[in-house]
Amino acid sequence: VHWTAEEKQLITGLWGKVNVADCGAEALARLLIVYPWTQRFFASFGNLSSPTAILGNPMVRAHGKKVLTSFGDAVKNLDNIKNTFAQLSELHCDKLHVDPENFRLLGDILIIVLAAHFPKEFTPECQAAWQKLVRVVAHALARKYH
């Protein structure tokens, strides 16, 4: 994947403002609410029976932070995303059996969360760079499936 200097700047510039705990929790909660079938991968998280329960669930919050923290590894390693996510791809494919389509869904949700949190900064150019990034990350996570 080739990144232009502008794309790198748009991604890293916005990432520097992201509250990983809050945005991660919101992104995962939205995924579980908007696409309820994804809840089956989180059966150990306890009560996911309603949007209120999901939004207040500390395990959702903690895992959302973990997910977005690892997404930060992509931001730090834009030129080596495939290798950055090799182990996570293996885990999600071989052990957790997550449908790789869910990575794309979470990426789309992350775009919505970023747009909501940063309405001024999230210009169409910024969105284009981030869409490219979430697509590359989703592809890297799905790599073990191919």
Curated annotation (Swiss-Prot):
Q: Where is the Globin domain?
A: 2-146
Task: Alphabetically list the UniProt keywords.
Answer: Heme, Iron, Metal-binding, Oxygen transport, Transport
Q: Which GO terms describe its cellular component?
A: blood microparticle; haptoglobin-hemoglobin complex; hemoglobin complex
Biological processes per GO annotation? hydrogen peroxide catabolic process
- Tissue expression summary: Red blood cells.
Q: Does the keyword Transport apply?
A: yes
Against InterPro entries, the record matches this protein to: Globin, Globin-like_sf, Globin/Proto, Hemoglobin_b, Hemoglobin_oxygen_transport
- List ligand-binding residues for heme b: 63, 92
Q: Name one Pfam family in it.
A: Globin
Q: Which GO terms describe its molecular function?
A: haptoglobin binding; heme binding; metal ion binding; organic acid binding; oxygen binding; oxygen carrier activity; peroxidase activity
- Quaternary arrangement and interactors, per the entry? Heterotetramer of two alpha chains and two beta chains.
Q: Which family does it belong to?
A: Belongs to the globin family.
What is the stated purpose of this protein? Answer: Involved in oxygen transport from the lung to the various peripheral tissues.
Q: What is this protein called?
A: Hemoglobin subunit beta
Origin organism is Anas platyrhynchos platyrhynchos (Northern mallard)
